[in-house]
Amino acid sequence: MAPKSIIGLLSLLPVTAVLALDPSCAPGGNFDLSVWSLQLPTGSAGKVDTIKSRDLQGCNGYTGPTFFTDKSNGELILTAPGNPDITGCATTSGSEHCRTELREVDPATGQNTDWAPAGTNTLTVAMKVIQADDGSHGTAIGQVFAAAASKPLAEMYYSQKGDITVGVKQGPSGNQAITKLGTVPLGTYFTYIMSYSDDVLSISINGNKTTLDTFSWGTPNCYFKSGNYNQGKTAVTSEVHIQSIAVVHDQE
């Protein structure tokens, strides 16, 4: 990845100031989706439908039943069905849950990418949750994913009570250590920053930063995921609205 690259950057303006979003466009007309592919809750078990970066981009890019523009304000809406045993939704290999989730790619090629945590690596999202699932910790809205281990190093959750937590796996085969990051009521905008920079993992909620232990992971190459990864026990559909999203890397 190029040094001092700023990827997928959109202005993080206050809610009342976000005037640039076009409600008539597909999400790709309002957000730089060149750095993302999209995993959907459709397809077959272990092989979900994936929309490539090139097909997401532009005002006439991909839109679908679970990934679309809010016609009132241009925000990106992502919905995900609940328990696949009830809803029949498709899951990725190694997962028991369904998702409408963005996965980081190389903007030059559209291929999957990862990065070293020794540099600067941040994911900043301004968003709100309209409906969280009824899983133990709620809907996963952001991940730092370890590439070689093919496991989430850190998953950030939003519960039906508005509690925001993060689960950090205690090594590639370890259980998650859960840390509470804050509380934001359903339907309320907030901004999170996931950072794995200078070999230090941290998450900020509305400016309140929590530094996290990475246990026995070492410093694996990782990539970001963001969106709506439903962890529910029932058929409850989760709904996430994204107002802005930015990925920044500096590998110098």
List each language-model region with its residue ranges:
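Ligand-recognition surfaces built from glycine- and aromatic
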Residues: 23-30, 120-122, 215-252
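Short, aromatic/His-centered strand-loop micro-motif at the edge of beta-sheets
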Residues: 166-191
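Short strand-turn-strand beta-turns centered on an Asx-Gly dipeptide
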Residues: 204-208
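Short tryptophan-centered beta-strand motifs in secreted/extracellular beta-sheet-rich domains
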Residues: 125, 188-196, 201-203
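Secretory/extracellular carbohydrate-interaction modules
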Residues: 58-63, 67-164
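N-terminal module-boundary/linker segments of secreted carbohydrate-active enzymes
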Residues: 18-61
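Short, surface-exposed beta-strand/loop "edge" segments at domain boundaries and coil↔beta transitions
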Residues: 82-93, 147-153, 172-177, 211, ...
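Fungal secretory targeting signals
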Residues: 1-20
